[in-house]
């Protein structure tokens, strides 16, 4: 029997010792992580007061007696020129954080972290940094990494959340603000009249910080002929016990003007009751199969505490899921026959589950793989390749690490049955992963096959977004690199999103404010070399 979702509740927490160790565990691997043997990696270096590095064992086997050192070369280093230590045991698929509590000096220095295990595995990473007394500032980029040239093409937006294209050979970019206004960028400038304005339909947003608003926008694969597009936004709820409703709606372009939508054409497909202000998800994208995929968060609040088992693992609720809908059949939509819970317990709309806040996802243009960035809770951000029927662990797991493992016992779920991230990073690196795209454009051949993404910011008080990419080696292990930026200048922005034009070239959304009070939002083109 068809199990239709009606008014279901949902809600982005976007969003002095020498050695500190956290989160060291050993876990079984899922089918979408292909590892062979042990592999030691140095994943990240962060500065400030002292320096932090993360050592990771990406293999299945434990590593022992990992000797590490952190060395500063260049500049005037008064204290902390070289620090060494030993980690007795680093289990398979685990990581440990090492810290130098204080470095004092002046000038530009090269920071090198090396590590070697008794088994022979070793790793090295070098970053450039500026020393100013006791403060160490890590410069953007990794040694040997690709360089990203970013060019501002639009400004004056209020918290832009979405940038996409219509796929209609018009070469336009369509940008959505969190406030509900959607604009067109055409022939090098933004059109004055909004393509669509949803602001009067939406819940009243906090202008300082909010995770509600216009969160999703995508165009039908045959938009050039049928003029259909879809939005995901936050609206007031009639239920006083709920924070708001998330609305998935369909619209039509105006029959008279291709740069303006028909505002009277709204057809609501799904209305989701939201208990909290955060974890809204909202990403919309059509897959290579022609179906509409929808990202839905876990209902918000900390720790997925709604209901007895939370929402991520509850297949009777829409919350904490990736949905797959057939918007070309049915009323108001149809269900693909191979959705995993068709004909059995669980909602028919569900494609995959066990997510906290799948805020951004995208499909690889070549392989069709679905890359989902799931925003973490306290410690870890993750990137998943999502498959039909996959359980991605939340709240049993946060990334590769136990969060509430007792829930697996309660639900009779084995850890071996879960799907684990292809990559994760700790909150020492950043606070909220912003999913991007596997680059398949033509203007940056060196970047083809690299997954370009970002982190919202290293902190909430000062904008500190980071621009990254992942590369996959022959054994299926993904390595993270920070792009080098021209003139070593940090972004000094919050990263809000990424998008593609019709040719597969990439764009980035940023703001230097956390909310929509000021028109501080910007659009940047990205060229990689």
Where in this protein do the model-derived segments appear?
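Asparagine-centered strand-capping/turn motif at beta-strand->loop junctions
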Residues: 55-59
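Terminal connector regions
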Residues: 79, 103-136
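Secretory targeting signatures
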Residues: 1-35, 68, 113-115, 135
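Intrinsically disordered, low-complexity Pro/Gly/Ser/Thr-rich segments with frequent PxxP/GP/PP motifs
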Residues: 77-106
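Acidic, Gly/Ser/Thr-rich repeat motifs that build Ca2+-stabilized beta-propeller blades
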Residues: 138-301, 360-363, 368-376, 429-474, ...
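Surface-exposed loop and turn segments in beta-propeller and other repeat-based domains
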Residues: 193-209, 264-280, 329-351, 395-428, ...
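Short acidic/proline- and small/hydrophobic-mixed sequence motifs that coincide with surface turns
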Residues: 61-65
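Conserved blade-ending motifs and adjacent loop-strand segments that build the rim/top face
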Residues: 477-502
């Amino acid at each position: 029997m068809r199990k239709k979702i009606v008014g279901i509740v949902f809600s982005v927490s976007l969003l002095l010792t020498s050695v500190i160790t956290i989160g060291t565990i050993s876990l079984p691997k899922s089918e979408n992580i292909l590892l062979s043997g042990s592999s030691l990696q140095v994943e990240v270096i962060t500065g400030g007061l002292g320096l932090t590095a993360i050592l990771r064992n990406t293999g299945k086997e434990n590593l022992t007696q990992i000797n590490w050192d952190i060395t500063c070369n260049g500049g005037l280093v008064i204290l902390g020129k070289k620090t060494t230590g030993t980690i007795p045991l680093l289990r398979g698929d685990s990581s440990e954080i090492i810290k130098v509590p204080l470095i004092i000096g002046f000038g530009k220095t090269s920071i090198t972290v090396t590590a070697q295990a008794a088994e022979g595995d070793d790793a090295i990473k070098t970053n450039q940094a500026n020393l100013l007394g006791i403060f160490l500032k890590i410069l953007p980029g990794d040694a040997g990494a690709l360089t990203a040239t970013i060019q501002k093409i639009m400004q004056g937006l209020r918290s832009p959340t979405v940038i996409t294209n219509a796929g209609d050979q018009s070469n336009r970019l369509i940008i959505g603000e969190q406030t509900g206004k959607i604009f067109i960028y055409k022939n090098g400038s933004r059109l004055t009249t909004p393509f669509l304005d949803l602001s009067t339909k939406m819940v009243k947003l906090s202008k300082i910080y909010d995770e509600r608003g216009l969160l999703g926008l995508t165009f039908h694969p045959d938009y050039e002929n049928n003029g259909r597009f879809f939005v995901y936004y936050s609206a007031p709820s009639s239920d006083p016990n709920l924070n708001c409703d998330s609305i998935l709606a369909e619209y039509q372009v105006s029959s008279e003007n291709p740069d303006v939508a028909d505002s009277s054409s709204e057809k609501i497909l799904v209305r989701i009751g939201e208990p909290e202000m955060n974890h809204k998800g909202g990403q919309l994208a059509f897959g290579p199969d022609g179906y509409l995929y929808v990202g839905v968060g876990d209902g918000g609040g900390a720790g997925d505490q709604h209901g007895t088992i939370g929402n991520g693992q509850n297949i009777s609720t829409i919350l904490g899921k990736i949905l797959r809908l057939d918007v070309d059949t049915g009323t108001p939509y149809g269900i693909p026959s191979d959705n995993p819970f068709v004909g059995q317990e669980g909602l028919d709309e569900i494609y995959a589950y066990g997510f906290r806040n799948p805020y951004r996802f995208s499909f690889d243009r070549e392989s069709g793989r679905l890359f989902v960035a799931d925003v973490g809770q306290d410690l870890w951000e993750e990137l998943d390749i999502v498959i039909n029927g996959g359980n991605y662990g939340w709240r049993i797991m946060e990334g590769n690490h136990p969060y509430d493992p007792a829930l697996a016992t309660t639900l009779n779920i084995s850890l071996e049955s879960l799907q684990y991230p292809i990559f994760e990073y700790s909150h020492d690196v950043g606070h909220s992963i912003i999913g991007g795209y596997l680059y398949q454009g033509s203007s940056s051949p060196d970047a083809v096959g690299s997954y370009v993404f970002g982190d919202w910011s290293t902190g909430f008080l000062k904008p500190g977004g980071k621009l990254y990419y992942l590369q996959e080696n022959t054994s299926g292990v993904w390595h993270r690199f920070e792009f080098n930026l021209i003139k070593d200048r940090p972004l000094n922005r919050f990263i809000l999103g990424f998008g593609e034009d019709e040719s597969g070239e990439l764009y980035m959304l940023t703001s230097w404010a956390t909310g929509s009070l000021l028109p501080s939002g910007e659009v940047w083109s990205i060229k990689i070399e």
